[in-house]
Curated annotation (Swiss-Prot):
It holds the Pfam family Ribosomal_L31. This is Large ribosomal subunit protein bL31. It comes from Shewanella pealeana (strain ATCC 700345 / ANG-SQ1). The gene is rpmE. Binds 1 zinc ion per subunit. Part of the 50S ribosomal subunit. Zn(2+) binds at C16, C18, C37, C40.
Length: 70
């Protein structure tokens, strides 16, 4: 490998919204904030829940909710 052309590889912290903290190695260089992780993802936990990111469902229903009603 050539010297001086590869990015730095360091340990960073990935923090999920559920509070789970994961230490990983990455070239990103800064801490990550995750929406879902293996501890809270519905596929891994076996639970189903609606994940409304930023009120998108409410915004959609407000714009197009009247079209479904006759």
């Amino acid at each position: 490998m050539k010297a001086g052309i590869h990015p730095d590889y360091a340990e960073i912290t990935a923090t999920c919204t559920c509070g789970n903290v994961i230490k990983i190695n990455s070239t990103v260089g800064k801490d990550l904030h995750l929406d879902v992780c293996g501890a809270c993802h519905p596929f891994y936990t076996g639970t189903q829940k609606v994940m409304d990111t930023g009120g998108r469902i409410d915004k959609f229903n407000k714009r197009f909710g009247a079209l479904g009603k006759k």
